[in-house]
From Swiss-Prot:
Basic and acidic residues composition bias: residue spans: 262-276
Species annotation: Bombyx mori densovirus
Domain of life: Viruses
Name listed for the protein in its UniProt record: Putative non-structural protein
Location of the region described as Disordered in the Swiss-Prot/TrEMBL record: 262-341
Length: 455
């Protein structure tokens, strides 16, 4: 093995900290599959330094007729004699310091996994947020974030599947094989073709990676290892402490937003007035008292008019404007009395739009209505014109850039869409159980009654 493969250059970061080299790669396990995977087990347990890792990769190029377990043991024994890298006191001290940080990584990983699985541990997160001080904003390098992301993905792959290769390498190889399978004209054989292509391609990829590691080229994947000295361990702990505080700050923000959403769902539906905002208690009181106040408004106006008529007046003139506003009089004037039908409980019983109209955000005229009903009503009618507009593009020649901005294509690049157009696709069926009951969409009718004069 050439000396070029063992030489690594150290480049300090922006903040002056250099926890580990950027030219290292963490636990490269994309090697040839030999026998009972003894080489993978020994490599995972014993590779801690870049020299041991490189010598282990060199052993894969050598031919050996021994048993795999004995061959792997001999490789690492030869490594110790060749480079003579013993476990020093600095290494033991560093491991004690980093152990606490590893527990913190495990705790945060479990918490984020719980969020993903919708099994939130709110109590433990609250305790974590209360005990941590304000975070310090630190700028870290992208390679360090990539290292922790790869590490978490590898741990998850070990727990859930039998995958024994790094996640990015395996995913990239699977994607290449999958593209080849989709390009096959015979669909019934595409799956078998995919599995047949996995094994040889992984072997080729392993050989290419080993060759790149030996040459130490720029295109090789970075190998991350743990610090080798006490100074590097101290810098690593300082960096991770600052980075951990920033990560906990993100957890605090995430938990705070989740807590607000949870409280918003448990509280009573807030009613919004168009003229001025009201509090939750006021809106709740208005919603419950609206029906009674509307029904009793007519009787209250009649009582006020009757009291005003019976009250002695010193003036000779009579206020005729108040008489014109009265609904019924003792003389039996013909008036129109409007009564509402089919009033839902979710909406207020104020004056509603005209006959046959749909209640929306602007048709209430200042009435107190539910904002959730408006949102559902607008969402229910929004997809129909969009669907019809998209149907018109089928089986036609259209520029791709006019329809979407996500695809980086040429402006005058044309494609063809082939899809059957039928009446059902243009006007889809609307099931009453799904949209009629979910939206506030009611027709309000008025009943006109004539009050006959009484003698």
């Amino acid at each position: 093995m050439s000396t070029q493969s063992g030489g690594f250059t150290r480049t300090p970061g922006k903040d002056g900290l250099n926890p580990f080299d950027e030219d290292y790669v963490d636990l490269v396990r994309c090697m040839r599959n030999r026998g009972e995977h003894e080489e993978y087990t020994d490599l995972l347990d014993n590779v801690n330094t870049p020299r041991e890792l490189l010598s282990a990769m060199e052993s894969f190029e050598e031919s050996s007729n021994e048993i795999p377990s004995q061959a792997a043991t001999g490789v690492f024994a030869e490594t110790g004699n060749r480079y003579d890298v013993p476990r020093s006191q600095d290494w033991d001290t560093m491991m004690k310091v980093v152990s606490a940080e590893e527990e913190m990584i495990e705790f945060l990983t479990e918490e984020f996994s719980a969020f993903i699985q919708k099994d939130c541990k709110n109590n433990s997160l609250e305790e974590l947020i209360e005990t941590v001080d304000e975070p310090k904003l630190v700028h870290s390098r992208t390679c360090i974030d990539e290292y922790y992301l790869t590490l978490i993905l590898q741990n998850k792959a070990k727990e859930t599947t039998d995958l024994k290769r790094p996640f990015p390498v395996s995913y990239q190889q699977m994607e290449l094989c999958h593209k080849d399978a989709l390009n096959s004209s015979e669909r019934e054989r595409s799956l078998d073709q995919f599995f047949r292509a996995v094994e040889p391609r992984m072997g080729i990829l392993a050989d290419q990676l080993c060759r790149r590691f030996e040459n130490n080229t720029v295109n090789a994947r970075r190998i991350y290892t743990t610090p080798l000295s006490l100074d590097q361990a101290t810098d690593f702990v300082k960096w991770f402490t600052n980075r951990g505080e920033l990560l906990i700050a993100e957890v605090r923000t995430l938990f705070g937003s989740m807590k607000q959403i949870k409280e918003r769902k448990t509280t009573h539906k807030t009613l919004v007035e168009d003229t001025h905002p009201t509090t939750i208690s006021e809106s709740y009181r208005l919603d419950t008292d609206t029906a009674e106040s509307q029904q009793s408004s007519q009787s209250e106006s009649e009582r006020e008019e009757e009291n005003r008529r019976n009250r002695p007046s010193s003036s000779r003139h009579i206020n005729t404007t108040r008489k014109r506003k009265s609904i019924t009089t003792s003389k039996g004037v013909l008036t129109k009395k409007k009564s509402l039908k089919n009033q839902p409980r979710a909406i207020s019983t104020y004056f509603t739009p005209a006959d046959g109209t749909i209640m929306n955000a602007g048709a209430s005229g200042g009435a107190l209505t539910s904002i959730q009903g408006r949102i559902r009503q607008s969402l229910s009618t929004r997809s129909t014109p969009e669907h019809i507009r998209n149907i018109m593009f089928y089986n036609t020649k259209w520029p791709r850039s006019l329809c979407t901005s996500k695809w980086p294509t040429t402006e005058f690049e044309y494609v063809y869409r082939t899809e059957s157009v039928c009446k059902e696709s243009i006007q889809p069926k609307r099931h009453s159980n799904n949209w009629k009951r979910a939206t506030i969409r009611m027709k309000v009718t008025f009943r006109t009654t004539v009050v006959t004069p009484t003698n």
